[in-house]
C-alpha cells in the first residue's frame, strides 16, 4: 500500500479504516469453491490485516498521523511533507513529497522472539522499525499519472542475521 503525493488539507482530519482481504477460497477446508467463498464473504471474514489511522493537515503541504495495525500489533506515527507541487501549465512538471514513519510492535515478548534461539537480552528497541520514502509524481494527462517511490526500511530486530536495512529479501516472516 504505497502512499500518494497528496497531503491532507490544512486543519482537516482524515480518519481511515483499511482492510486487507484474506483468502477467498481454501480447497483443504471446502471442496466447493462457491460455498467456501460465500462462507468467508469473499475474503472479508479472513482479514489478513486491519488498520485504523488519523491524519491531520498541519498545513496544505504538511500532514502528521498516528495509526494502529492488527499485523504485529503495530502502533505508528508518521509525517508527510510536500515541498514541491506540480503546476497545471507544467512550469513545475512534478511534485515531490517526503514520507517518514516510525512503528512500534506491542505484541507479547514470546511472540516477538518466536522461532529463534534467544541467547541475548530482550531490548525494547527490538520492537521499533523505521520507514522513509521520497515520492516523486507527475500527472501527465487527465488519465495518466506516474509515481516513483524510492524507499528505505529498517527493522531493529530480524530473525535472520542479514543486513536489517539493505536487503530487500524478506523471507523471515517479519
Task: Indicate residue ranges for each PLM-predicted region.
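Transmembrane beta-barrel domains of Gram-negative outer membranes and organellar outer membranes
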Residues: 1-121, 128-132, 138-140
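Detector for outer-membrane/organellar transmembrane beta-barrel domains
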Residues: 119-174
